[in-house]
Structure formats: C-alpha cells, structure tokens
Amino acid sequence: MAQQTFTGRKRVRKFFGHIREVAEMPNLIEVQKASYDQFLMVDEPVGGRLDEGLQAVFRSVFPISDFSNTSMLEFVRYEFEPPKYDVDECRQRGMTYAAPLKVTLRLIVFDIDEETGARSVKDIKEQDVYMGDIPLMTMNGTFVVNGTERVIVSQMHRSPGVFFDHDKGKTHSSGKLLFAARVIPYRGSWLDIEFDAKDIVFARIDRRRKIPVTSLMFALGLDGEEILSTFYKKIQYKKIKEGWRVPFDSNRFRGYSTINDLIDADTGKVVLEAGKKLTVRAARQLQEKGLKALRLSDEELVGNYLAEDLVNPKTGEIYAEAGEEITEKSLKGLNEQGYKELPLLDIDHVNIGAYIRNTLAADKNMTREDALFDIYRVMRPGEPPTIDSAQNMFQSLFFDSERYDLSAVGRVKMNMRLELDAPDTHRTLRKEDILAVIKTLVGLRDGRGEIDDIDHLGNRRVRSVGELMENQYRIGLLRMERAIKERMSSVDIDTVMPQDLINAKPAAAAVREFFGSSQLSQFMDQTNPLSEITHKRRLSALGPGGLTRERAGFEVRDVHPTHYGRICPIETPEGPNIGLINSLATFARVNKYGFVETPYRRCKDGRVTDEVVYLSAMEEGRYSVAQANVQLDPKGRFVEDLIVCRDGGTRDVVLIPADKVDFMDVSPKQLVSVAAALIPFLENDDANRALMGSNMQRQAVPLVRAEAPFVGTGMEGVVARDSGAAIAARRTGVIDQIDATRIVIRATDDLDPTKSGVDIYRLMKYQRSNQSTCINQRPLVKVGDMVAKGDIIADGPSTDLGELALGRNVLVAFMPWNGYNFEDSILLSERIVKDDVFTSIHIEEFEVMARDTKLGPEEITRDIPNVSEEALKNLDEAGIVYIGAEVRAGDILVGKITPKGESPMTPEEKLLRAIFGEKASDVRDTSLRVPPGVQGTIVEVRVFNRHGVDKDERALAIEREEIERLAKDRDDEQAILDRNVYGRLADLLENRQGIAGPKGFKKDTKITRAVIEEYPKSQWWLFASPNDKLMAEIEAMRKQYDESKKGLEQRFLDKVEKLQRGDELPPGVMKMVKVFVAVKRKIQPGDKMAGRHGNKGVVSKIVPIEDMPFLEDGTHADIVLNPLGVPSRMNVGQILETHLGWACAGLGKRIGQTIDAYYQKQDLKPMRETLRKIYGEDETIKSLNDAELLELARNLKPGVPIATPVFDGAKEADIEEMLKLAGLDASGQSTVYDGRTGDTFDRKVTVGYIYMLKLHHLVDDKIHARSIGPYSLVTQQPLGGKAQFGGQRFGEMEVWALEAYGAAYTLQEMLTVKSDDVAGRTKVYEAIVRGDDTFEAGIPESFNVLVKEMRSLGLNVDLHNSKLATPTSEAAE
C-alpha cells in the first residue's frame, strides 16, 4: 500500500495486510458535521430549502393565527449573518461561537365580512426579525460554548414505529405468554394493545387505565358487525335434509377431532370415522381427491358464533345478534323460524381464536358515543364529557399532525412491519394502521409471525446533533408561539410590525440551555487526538428520552449480532455505563432515517464485484454476507464451493454455496471502532483486555517528543488527519514562507481568478486543551517544498510525520526484577527520565477578576500590603507576572487588593492615623497565588478590560504586540498577492502586441519582459493589447486584485477594532486576568503507564542505567515488565508486538549500516538493495531520488515502521521471517546480563520493542497533604478531597483497627482534637506553639449535632455532669 504523499515518502510503512480495501473509509467526524449541516442549511439552495432541519421547525410552528382568525403571521425564509467573533477569539474571550439568525416574517391582516364571514386580505407587512444566536460547529465537529469546546454526543433511542412483544410468562402465575403491541410515535401519545390472562384484548393510551380494544374500534367508527367481519371470515352453513352443508377447506379442518363420522355432503360417503383426528396431510389429500363439502349435524353447529344479525325481514325484529354463540336452544328457535342459511364466523379455537368476539361480548360500550365518552374519562378523569369535546380529544390524540408525529422513520417502520403502503409524508396514524396492529397482534396469539427484538439495530436509531438541536429549537418556538398569540389578540394589529409581536428570548434560551446543560452536551475529552475523535463518534443510550443506568437491563447492554460493522463490540466504558455508551465502527455511517449502515461488496454468481453498497440492519436481514477474509482467486471468484456466511434472517453462521452469497465485508476492520483498530494483533488479545486497551489509548498524554509506533495498524494516518490535530494542505502549491507560528502556501492548482492564490495556515503554539494537556503544532515543510492537496504540512500534539503517536517505542525485557515489578508494577531505567522519553507539558490556567464591591472597586496592582519585595519580584508595574517567570506553589501571579469594611478604631489607632496619615490598612490582600503542587513557567498572560475602563500598561503592551502580528500577516499576504498577481499579469502580457501602455511606451510595439520591468508594478495595468479575450481576463484579474486588497485591509481594521474595543465581562467585573503556567512533568514512581493491549501498571522504581539488565551488545533495557502479567490475562498481542518491534529495530540497524557505508563509499546501491529486501518491490521507494532516499533511510534508522491491520495482520511465520531478515534469533529471546553483577541470567529472556503510553493519571495530580484547612460548616469536620484541600477520612473500619490494637488515646485524639472538637483543636495548637505536649479532648461537634437532631424530633437530651466523672469519661457518656 504505497502512500505517495509528502509525509508518506519520508517514512514508508511496510504493510502486512493481504485484503485489498475497495471502500474508502468515511471521514471519521462525518457523523457530527453532516448532521449539523443538514440542520442549519446555511446557504439557501436555488428553489428554496427542503423541508428539513431548521426550515422544518419554522414550517411546523408557523403560520400563527390569533384567536379570532383576523390576522396571521407567516414564515417566509431565514438566513444567518456572519458570526461576530471567530473560533479563536471566542475561545480566548470565553464567548460562544454563534451566528445571529435573521428570519423574514409576513404579517397578514384580514377584513371579515360580518354577514357572510368571508375573509379578505386587508394588509400585508414583511419584516426581518432577529431570532437569537445559533451556535456554529467548528471545522473539527465541536462547539465553542462560553469559551470551552464541547461535543454533542449522538443518542441511540428506540425507533418510532410499532413493536410486538410478550411478557415472557412473568405476569401471570400460570406462565402463559401475554402478547402486547405498542405504537411509539416520535412525539405524541403511546398506544398499547395487550392481551390479559383471560385472552381478552385491551388498549391503553399513554399507559393509563385499560379499555377493551373493541371500544377503541367503536370510537374509530366501526360497529359490531364490521369489527367481526374485519377479523374473521364468514362461512355459509346451508340447511339440507340430513343436516347442514359446509364448504370443505383443508386449512380450516386440519387438526379437527371428529365426534361423529365426517360425511361427504355430495356423495354421502364416510370420509373419516368418528373419534379420529384429521391430520394436515390427510386433509390435503381429501381436498386433492375433490372433496367439496361436508355434511354436519345440528349438534356440531352448537358452540359456533353468528357472523351477522339475524333479522325478521317483515317485522324488523332481531332474533340473534352478530357474535352471539349458538346454543341448542337458540338453534332450535332458528330452525323453527325456518332459516335455510346461517352465516357463521370461521373460528375453530385451534388456528383462529375467538379473542376479538369475546372482547366484543365483554365490552359494556355498544355505540361510538359510549366508547368516546369512556376514552375521554380515562384521559381526563373528573371532567364531564360532551360529545364534541370527546370527539375532538380522540381526534387530537392520534390524528392531528400538531399533536402526533410518527416521523418519516416511524411511517417507514410501520409500513415494513405491517405490510402497508402509506407514503412516508403521512405522519399521523390512520384507521387502517390501528386495525392492522390489532390483526397482527391477534395473529401472534394464534401462533402466526414472530415478536420483535427491541435490541435489533433495525429497531434502534441514532439521533445526531442536528436532530437533537431541531427538537430543542422546536420547544423554544412553541413557547414563543403562545406569547405571540396572546400579543396578537391584545394589540392593535393594524399598527404593529412583526418585530413588535416577537420576543425571541424563549427560542434563544432553549438553545442555550441545550448546549449548556443537556446530558448529551459534554465537555470535550481533549487529552489527545484519538480521544477527541472517539468522543465525537460516541453513541449514548442515556440522556433525555433514553434509558437510565439503573433501569437498563443486561439485554440492552449486550452485544447484538446486528452490531456487526455498525457498533464496536469492544470499545465501551467499564463500570455502570458498560454497553450503554458505545462507539461507531470504522466504516459505519448514519443514514437519513438515523439507522446505522455498514458497507458491503456486492457478489454476483460467485464473483465479488467492486460495487460497494451500504446496508442498514433491517435490509441486511434479507441477505447472506461472507466475511472479508474469504479466499478469492485473482478474478475475484470464490475459491471454495461452500462459503461461511452470516445469514441475515436467522442471524446464525451457515455454510452457503458460492453462487448464493449476496454480499461480502469490505474490510476486516469494519467491525471495530477507531480506537480498537489502532491495536495491532487485536485478534490475539482477550476481549476484556482489548476493551481496556482501547479505553486507555484515549488517556495517553501527548509527550514532548512524539514517536510513531514501530508496530502500527495503518490507521494512524487516518486518525491524525481526520481529528484535525495534524494540518493538511487545502490546495496543491509551493511553500512560500514559514516560521514556527504559520505556514504560507502559494497555490499552483485550481487557481480561481476570483479567489486569493494564497493560503495561510496558523499553527497553535502551546495552547491549553480541555484536559490541560499542551496543544502545539510544528511545521514539517520547508520553503520551496511542493505539496499536494491533502498532504500533511504540520504535526500537532501526539502526531509524528502525520501519524498518530500516543506513546514511545521502548526496549522491554519480560522478567522479574527483585520484586519491583510484582503485581503489574513497572520498572523503568533512568535513561527514560534523563532523555525526556516520557516527559509531557501540561498547561494550567488561573484567572482572577477585579470586581466592583459595595465597599469600592477591587484593584489589580503591585502595591500589596504586608508583602516583601522578594515576593513581588516576578510582577511588572501593573502587578501581573512576567512571561517566562519561573513560579512555584505560593508565589503571587496577579496582585489584587480588596477594600475591607471599616472596623471601629481604638483611641491609640486614631492617634497613629492622625500622625502618620491614611494607612493602607483598609484593604486586604486577595492576590492570585500558585496553588500547592504546581511549579512551572508562565507562558501566556491575557488581560480583559471592561468597556470604558482605562487599560493598564500590560494590557496595552499585549494589544500592541497583537496589532503588530496582524499587520505582519496583512503585509505578507499583500506581498504574496502582489507577487502572484503581477507574475501572472507579466506572463499574460509578455510577447503580445501593445496598442497602449504607461507614459513613454511606444504604441504598436511588442511587450517584452524587459519593457514591462522598466515600469513600476502599479502601472502594468495600463498596457493594452488588441486581443479582447485577454483584456477581459486582465480586467477580471484587476477587479479581483483590488477586491482582495480592500478585503485584506478591511479584515485587518476589523480585527484591530475588536482588539481595542472593551471586552464583554460578567456583570460587576471591571477587569479579568488569565495566567497560563506550563508545567513540565517527567515520569516518576506512582505514574500510570500502559501498553495498547490493556497491560497497565504503575511505575514502582526508577533504576540507574547501569543496574538495568543489558543485552550482549551492551544495550540496557528501558523497561522491565513481569512475565506473569501475560498468561492469566490472555493478551498475547503484547508478546507478538514485542517480537515484531524487535525485528523492526534490528532492520533499522541494518539500514543504519548502509547509511555509514554510503558516507564512506558514496554508493547508494547497498541501501536500495537492503530496502528492496525489506519492502519488496515498493513503488514509493523506487520513485525516490538520492536525496529523498537518504532522508528516508535516516528516518528508518531507529526502526522500520510496519502496519499489521486488525484481523488481517502479520502471522507467526511473517514475524519469524522479519527476525531472520534482521539477523536476530527467530525465538525472539536473547541472553540477558544482570546490570548489578554482570552475570548472565539463567534463562533466555523475551526482549523487544513495545509501544508504551503514559496515561493521564499522574501522581502529581493525586498526591495531597493537609495540616490545617477548611472545615465543614455543620459538623465542623475537615472537608474531603484534594480540590477542597481536605483531610483523609478516618472511617469506621479504621476505627475498628485502632480498637483492635487497644490504642485508646490515639483513637480518642483521632475522633476529637484531630477532627471536630473545636475548642480542643485550638488548645492543641496553642500547646504545640508553647512547646508543650499536654492537651485535653472535649466533646466532638458531631455529638452536639446528634443531640440537636434528637431534640428536633421532640426528644430532650441532657448531659449530666456527675462530680466523680473525669472530663474524658464525661465525653464518653
């Protein structure tokens, strides 16, 4: 897999995958971006916007009419204005990155004719109305809200539609299965239809009291006969001499037990003797022999049900009603009336049960009105129903599009499940839908059909950002609608404009609330690029309208066969959220209905084509799918005759003939998520450890020097590019200018004359991420380099040459070492600390605000009372710390004084005041100090001033610096623009016939390069040529040039204006200062480290290099791991990685030798030969020139990087071959010597290179100590936790331990003076100050709290102090 990219030529990965990938992996943050773009639709397409997203919300709420229908407010269109601040400015100022929404509304006022009631339009007014700000998504799929980056996580919820289920026999003691159906709309009332233990069918609306389902059908407008004819067939029994003639149908009579002989009605022959059962086969044979009808006696009619009302045609008297059961008595009566034909219901109690007929019989309501009243009473208990109110309420429950919405998805699901064909624009229920649900449910009870599996991904869908936001905005607009209606009715409608009717606060508040406090709007995990990408691809079943942790059972959390290729079976958190929070698989995408789809290659007649089809779980159910690693011949035909497939219908693995296979997986890694796809040899790891491995990669801290893994999977480049950590070129071009903070590229391709030919890429330097890790980008290119579109031009945090690099490759030895690696501890070499291998930079942010208080304004100043000059040495004259100052815990960062309340003065004080004048005692020092445990360097200071407050020196200096930077940007861009435009102009004019030109140009002479360069550039535009086309092009170019120039200047002025304008600060704040401290964290004992295979541990000791075990060539191991950590955990992938990494490093050494040979003999042949042996015939390497080849070899010297994709990677034989190529022992083991004694260890040791990560759990953030500190207000016990500077809890079990030792005095002081005996605490302190060590324990405050609680219950508790008691025993009482 040759990557012909700029970085791909600098370091080539050897690829071990065998399977050719046909499908392109979709962009990894597509889920977020596509969804939100569809919601906003910023640019209005020609012909107007489609009815979706924001447009759909406005369409559904508008038009709004007033109560009397005399006026109407219509929605016309909406548009966005440009955002006030760009993303970076919002981050710095703590603003939300949002664009103002402008909506055009039309107010129509009607005249109403009093006699006819006809409306005529009286007045129409249109106006643009501001409707609040809508947050915009950044390039990387995040939102900036109040200055912090947030991610909206997609939610998995139950798809709208109809679901059939049973109670698994748990409701009733007999264990009978009670079936139920539930119609779930997107919004609106739920409809449940269920059986009870007596097989009567009931309906419930919104989980309220149940009503017989026939009442619901009455309310829908059916009568008893129609209900029966809907659910049952009608059979005509005809009277003949010997009994009744019945048409014979094999399906109906199968399983029929005879009481009397069965007799053919036409021939009179006995078909089946009495007492026998008619089998299915026998029934079919009889039908084939031509049996038309049977003769049944009177007694066999008894127990059947009538299908129609039997009416006397003359008198209109009803003898029997439809659904009535025939008894001997009623049959006798019917015979007497002389009925020759009886229409009966086709109910045999075997294939067709009498459930609906029994429900009809049990139902007390007989008419539509009764049924509507009954439903009204259930929905609104206590209100007396009228026929109109009952009808309106029933209509609005399921048939009103305002109140009920199935959504397109729900309609599609209903159609599929019930085999209906309603269009997906019909979003409410229909009568047919409800009847079809009841029919299907009754069919289930009769044993036809299957119940639904609610964990099937066809029944769960994803709500992404756009949809969640749409629902939220709709809520806001509906709140607004009420206010508008009231206002329209109360004001004089002829004089107002739309603006006066609208208050956009509710809409804006709904959006703000959603982004600020919704459970699905989360603070982005920005530890490293992988954690960002994973966070954006997360699917959560929690959140509003979803599950809760407590209620979610095992089934919901479990892996389901339909997850294959859609949701990762590995990556999910450990703990209470396991299985509720999932990750999207690598190739998965979400379709327009919100179902997760995965790509497959189509197979035709035993041959696999390159056509890629995306299938959802429902569609996949119809096909059989082969795996990606099926053997194919070069033409793409299956080699085997029988192929192992997943059968969609049964969801089992089956063997299928090659020509019957429908689809094949596109890639072996399509079933796992991004994080899991980054683990090499994932297939050799136990699932539990793979889960830990994928979760821990997200916690890896970006290191000072990133290094890509020797053993990768080929996904590293994709993640680095899609996460936005590494910068990719937007257009093909040449590097024009470069420094640490920006890259300027002159575009050479797709030069649109209307666009600037220059791209400027700003790099982020030492920015703080959400998790306080350091974001720093550095360029990979130099001036004059050619880059293509999409090439990586700068590395970000945790990326190396455009590949994700979360950790470092270190030399590992698997052996015990003096017990220091017992139980997953890790032993490190001092080299790792000395060479800064695992050193990371963390940036802490501290802020201080100067507020306006009641006693006067706070002041940021250097003049602080009672502070030595030494403590102020790092502050400038404004009282703010210098950039570059080294600070440690307790140092002042920003000096601040706060006025304090006047306390009454003593006469002595008054005298001193009078003599020495005003003293600075009326202020107290509230400076910002460095908190404990932090030590570092100041890297940035930002000062924010309220509008109208004078800026101090420091703020002005920062502003001047920023303006200089902006001016430099403008000038550079201008210079490149000039060079570009005038270069193109000269090329166009050169060697043309000139008919005009600047002053002094001879007419009708040739324009040569020399002639052009005589004149200043600004006059070049004056040249003219007879070619009209050329002149038009030059004119267009000039127009574009002037516009660009103007645009540049305008942008510069806008930015300067923003800088000089005051900042928007919270109310009461005059000034705010933010200080950023960079902390360098070297690795130390107590830090957590991990590999990629779930092999985690804590550093136990850092050993001098000379004491570490070493190899025969004198190389010392960097890290020693315990071999016992492997067998029981079954993550063998780490061992394979170790061997392969060992081979990579060995091959790197070989390449290093060829570099040395080149410097001696100036011959590159041995190098090319060595690379050919390693890589085979690699196109990229063949295409390199000598200089590029040398650069490649230098990059490969530490180790040759390889890619071993998941489920398709290097096999044992490949690893052995690599080891042999490197000239190493194929066993992967080496003789190792003890660094302390120099002796060899008794056995050979597995040694190799493993990729280790340093995780975000650093001991510096966790270690904590307290002497005195804050106490809880009520109990007076010390607070807990590091954040509160709390103490260590001495809990119940610890008390038991001291009791067990009989350490009474220690225990007493733990429970009193060291905790909540307030008086005792101060006494102890005084005693210590005096150098004394006697103290007395008093009564703990918590005892008083207990007494007060008992008193509050009305129990008076008194302490009686007996004369004999010692003070300690009194406390014990």
From Swiss-Prot:
CDD domains documented for this protein: RNA_pol_B_RPB2
Keywords attached to this entry: DNA-directed RNA polymerase, Nucleotidyltransferase, Transcription, Transferase
Gene Ontology CC terms: DNA-directed RNA polymerase complex
Keyword Transcription: yes
Reactions catalysed: RNA(n) + a ribonucleoside 5'-triphosphate = RNA(n+1) + diphosphate
MF annotations from Gene Ontology: DNA binding; DNA-directed RNA polymerase activity; ribonucleoside binding
PROSITE patterns, per database record: RNA_POL_BETA
EC number: 2.7.7.6
GO biological process: DNA-templated transcription
Class of the enzyme per the UniProt entry, highest EC level: transferase
Pfam families: RNA_pol_Rpb2_1, RNA_pol_Rpb2_2, RNA_pol_Rpb2_3, RNA_pol_Rpb2_45, RNA_pol_Rpb2_6, RNA_pol_Rpb2_7
Function: DNA-dependent RNA polymerase catalyzes the transcription of DNA into RNA using the four ribonucleoside triphosphates as substrates.
NCBIfam families (UniProt xref): PRK00405.1, rpoB
HAMAP family registered for this protein in UniProt: RNApol_bact_RpoB
Family recorded in the similarity comment: Belongs to the RNA polymerase beta chain family.
Assembly, per entry: The RNAP catalytic core consists of 2 alpha, 1 beta, 1 beta' and 1 omega subunit. When a sigma factor is associated with the core the holoenzyme is formed, which can initiate transcription.
Name of the protein this chain belongs to: DNA-directed RNA polymerase subunit beta
Organism encoding this protein: Rhodopseudomonas palustris (strain BisB18)
